[in-house]
Amino acid sequence: MKHIFIAIVCLLGSMSLQSCLHDDKEFFDESAANRIESTVENTQKILESSENGWQLHYFTGKGMTGGGYTFLMKFANGKVTVAGDAAIADPTERVTSSYTVDRSMGPVLSFNTYNNIFHFLGEPTYGEIEGDQGDWEFVVTKLTEDSIFVRGKKWENEMVFTRIPADLDWTSYLNSIADVQKRLGVNYRVGNSTDASKMIEINSSKRHILSRKANGQIVEQPFYVTTTGIHAVNEPVVLDGNEVQDFLVSPTGVLSAKDNEALTLKTYAPSIDTWIGNWTLSAMQGSCDITISKVEDEENMLKGTFTTGGYTYNIGLDFDPETGNLNLPSQMIEDPSDRYPALWLMNADLNKGALLGNGGMNIVWHGVAQEGDFEDDGTVADRGNVTDTFIALACTSKGEPITKDDKYIFVIEWYFLSNLTQNK
């Protein structure tokens, strides 16, 4: 009997506990839903309350390892108008698309229709399946009247929308940023120092600052451009024993530490001898060894010699003494196999599937990394193309492509050329 009584008491207690838990759960769910709905409404209200819009310092790459960008956005009636300093956008360009604020993971701000100024940082390309790892959906984590704190839904970078003052002109502001971008060089050093710890490297296309620690380790930090200079994201740059978060950029491109303007850095250009030697040329599908040497009696001309498929080829490279960079142009070269009268080493835009035939790629020296990176030289920009690839086509002696079964014959294929690294 005693055992039966204990069992009944336990059963009643369990039922009572379940009932209480059930009541609490219903109460919590209801209040949480109300709170989220209220936050959603408040987020949209605050977004559309700014007459001159919001500024967003936007970061790509997981853990903010990519570049930093500035976007200006005006929200109204479910639409958002965007301008920005990304390479794809002119300071005067504006693109309008739609946006939503929903409660899928708490309040989520979503740019739910395509905006070419904003979305391209997250778009996949042939070379990068995840693009630049950019978000266009953001979990709202905190709201004030002048700031909206968000976290990227996919890449989880923390960012802040800040209210733009009513008297700030968007075009003038973005033009000031663009002017700073144009003044940025690549290789900087304190004085004439050859000490790597007194040098930095600016990679404007990736928005990265590279520096070296005393032990030789390379440190890579993202930055965004301001109207007066550049701001290092995450950690300050350590340079000659000084920590620098912000660099000012002078009209002549000289860098100075914002908090210590006596610390200045000037650009330097590598000499032609920097390029002489043995290198590894890397592209998407692999790499090959290439030897670079001077061309006799030809000032600022170099020759690249490499072997592939059992044959040794020679290509021409132009040296620019002002920048210290090389240029790989589209050119006719000899076919060492004697199968064809000539080969046309032709530049191409692989992203658009276009053979171009004029222009080429610069090989930009990066002093901290001690490598040369391939970049489009801008020749075909007015056609809407970007050179990222070189292909050698079989040709007649007059430069006319030879075909087989109505297709061009590709002898050399360098897809998405990446860099030159020194062989040790």
Model-derived segments and spans:
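Acidic/polar, low-complexity intrinsically disordered N-terminal segments immediately downstream
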Residues: 21-108, 143, 166-190, 414-423
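An anionic, turn-rich surface loop/hairpin at beta-sheet edges
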Residues: 110-133, 229-242, 334-357
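Preference for solvent-exposed, low-hydrophobicity sequence contexts
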Residues: 158, 164-282, 293-297, 305, ...
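N-terminal glycine/threonine-rich, aromatic-flanked beta-hairpin/loop signature
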Residues: 61-106, 194-231, 285-332
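Sec-dependent signal peptide recognition
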Residues: 2-10
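Long, acidic/polar, low-complexity amphipathic helices and coiled-coil-like
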Residues: 79-220
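C-terminal motif of bacterial Sec signal peptides marking the signal peptidase cleavage site
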Residues: 15-19
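C-terminal structured domain segments
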Residues: 339-403
